[in-house]
Design a protein with these regions (language model features):
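Detector for the mature cores of small, proteolytically processed
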Residues: 1-106
Length: 106
């Protein structure tokens, strides 16, 4: 399958809220977990501006201390990870770097 970078991925806030709530509901109050991560615009544009990059793939990771994280890598037009390019992980996790309460995080 080839990728162009013009694929549409939008969903409604209602659908997005249902997805994130289902994820949050699988954890108990005592179990720490990551709701999301913040990545800055400059970092994302740097990843996406690599030659041949048409999008990004986001992998779920687990750090040595068992903290969840996201790993971002550019994807080329053939759908392959651009593993010789820039790869990102150091996002700012929520919690502690959360938005005000909304349908996606509360």
């Amino acid at each position: 399958m080839s990728y162009t970078g013009d694929e549409i991925h939008s969903i409604s806030l209602k659908d997005a809220g249902a997805l994130t709530k289902r994820y949050r509901d699988q954890f108990s109050v005592e179990t720490p977990y990551i709701k999301g991560e913040y990545f800055g615009k400059t970092a994302l544009l740097s990843l996406l501006s690599q030659t041949g990059c048409v999008g990004t793939r986001i992998y779920y990771g687990l750090k040595a201390d068992d903290t969840q994280c996201l790993v971002l890598v550019g994807v080329d037009g053939d759908g392959n990870d651009m593993t010789t390019g820039e790869i990102m992980e150091v996002g700012l996790p929520c919690p502690a770097h959360c938005s005000e309460a909304n349908d996606l995080n509360s």
